[in-house]
Amino acid sequence: MLLILALAGLAHADPAPAVDPGDLPPLPAASDEEASSAATVLAASSAEEDVVVGAAKREQSLGNVASAVTVVSGDRIRRFGYRTVAEAIAAVAGVYLVDNRLSYSVGIRGLNIPGDYNTRILVLVDGASVNEGWAAFAGLGWDTFVSIEDVSRIEVIRGPVSSVYGANAFFGIINIVTRGAAETPRAWAKTSINSINGSITSAGFAQGGVHQQLRGSLQFMDRIGETLSVPAIAPTSLSGDGSISFAGSIVGSYEGTFGQVRAYRYRRDSPFAPYNGDVTAGNPYYATDTQLLVEGGHTREVTKRLTIAGRAYANLYGYADHIVQQGSAPFDDQGRGDSYGAELRGRYELVVPQRLGLTAGTEATYYRTYSKSFTEGDDACPPDGGAACVPKNFNIEGVYAELDGQPSKNIGFTGGLRFDNNSVIDRRLSPRAALFIAEPEKYGIKLLYAEGFRNPSAYEAFFYDNTSFSRPINLHAETIRSYEAVLWAKPVSGLSTRLSGFYWDARGVVEQLPDPNDASLLQFQNAGQFVSYGLEAEASYRTSQGWYGFGGFTAERVGQADNGAAVAYGDVANAPALLGSLGISTPRIGGIAHLSGAMTYLGERATRPDLVTGEPGPRTPAWLGLDATIYLPNVRGFDVTAGIRNILGKRDLVVAPGDYDRTADPANQVTVFQVPGEGRELFLKVGYAY
């Protein structure tokens, strides 16, 4: 709250419009006066941060969205030198990033279940779901389809949105909107050197305009990694922290017809030898993800009141890991998840202009999945071999409708419902409702209610290898209820503020726990109830001189109960009670460069209980990250970005998932509570566009 008051005080000291015209494409002046010209540019830039498309599959303003939403603009992405989507959203109120050296995962409002891989967050790229069909994984770091150079803005939508999207929109949605041809150079290339993440090179092209365009991009990353020490795993330092990724895309549209093809391949090594790997091996573990997303569709305005859109899509995913074992041949896991689907939706304005509207649609997806685990040399399925082979095909159908209206200037509402049928898991009905009371463009309140669900993935519901994981038993859908009140205000030009009070209750959450019949194996179980409630505030401020600032904090209380016990608060693994972020960026100093600084605070967190004694593990201390960036845009066609991450050099002790526990010897089991986060990193990026 102090942050909001401070920004408000700064705003009253300088009531000028809130954007630096030099950071935006040139626009015609509104008049001959400089102030009017700046105001015209301000209006254009403000629309970028005030419009949301991912919360209801249509454009809405922030004041009329049935969620608490933050939009990370392209200008903010460039100024602060974010290198991945994960870095960009880690500075958003209530959001934190967890890199446990297996994957990059995102926590929201204190909820990040160890061993989860963003499966409770729906990730969209230009409206298409990235979550794959085998494990429901969605990458947001280097393990994703999208280069940060392609991103126009990122929408962070908190809370369940199953009433529109069905499964996976559980804790929230990350909607990545890429740059269109009109805002992309005809051709561009960028390369960077990073002291931990190695070399990153990307290039792309764009032709056409708003209604007819073709654009594409490529990105390659070769990570150097670090040498690290985890005494619980090995007495000596461990290397083998590298990774390699490749991503490419082609996107096009012609009038109302659109299509996109995106693909990536990502390999990550882990020096910490998960799944009882041999820590003395030079490369004890690596995993490879490969994914292809194809989508095409058409949108047509049938009448001024009726718009219809249809799309078809395919999402093809493959996973493989390789575990070097002590005293035996290596062990391999393979997973495959291919999904094919189609959606038809429409919007009809019952009362115009925008007084009452109905959005409705139907969607069907077919999933073909396969899992296989084997010791090398024995890869045949039974009865001819010892491999664990699990084929499973299923389909999901959904139908949804949402009514929204604004009976008066100051009052609006939304109410929606979706029914989903999973042919092998569960059927769910997901409602949401919202009431909006506002003085338009000045201040308002939103009262929000939503229910959501998440089906266990094919990996959770059916996978086993009898080496690290035992067979799951009768898993069912997770459910969540959300209550939230949002106060928002734009007290002066350039200043936006939000204060939220929230209560989330998630039940039947699938957790990765020791098998009650064999503690040396992990098993997926519908064991958990998680409750999170608290306050969240954020603010952003721009001036016409080019200053930009943002900040936020979340104070939450998170509780957990397993198998029907009473909810206990304070000792939930990976659940910080306090999150904070702050960023300030200068105008172009000397007309050349922006200087930006950012701070991220991650509160103290509990780790998992000791595997043997059941006693609480050591707590992870609070962590403060400081970053600095200098950004020189369009210097004779060149862009230059230089920065330093984690200036203090203090590593966050990341809460470790059960994958790292040493359980091969039942008489000498070791719980790995924490693994080190990244240290200080320097980077330099140079690009050219024409």
Regions found by a protein language model. Name each.
Residues R507, Y601-R608, L632-Y690:
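C-terminal beta-signal and adjacent terminal beta-strands/loops
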Residues G54, A86-E132:
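Extracytoplasmic beta-strand/coil segments of soluble accessory domains associated
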Residues S129-R158:
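Short acidic/polar hinge/loop motifs at secondary-structure boundaries
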Residues V85-A88, S105-R109, I121-D126, G141-T144, ...:
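N-terminal periplasmic accessory domains that precede
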Residues Q406-F413, G501-D505, Q525-D610, A689:
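Gram-negative outer-membrane beta-barrel transporters
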Residues D278-E301, G337, K392-F394, A438, ...:
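Outer-membrane beta-barrel signature, preferentially recognizing the C-terminal barrel domain
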Residues A18-R78, V125, E301, K490:
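Short, acidic, small-residue-rich periplasmic hinge/interaction motif at the N-terminus
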Residues S162-S163, N175, A182-T184, S192, ...:
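Periplasmic-side early beta-strands and strand-to-turn transitions of outer-membrane beta-barrels
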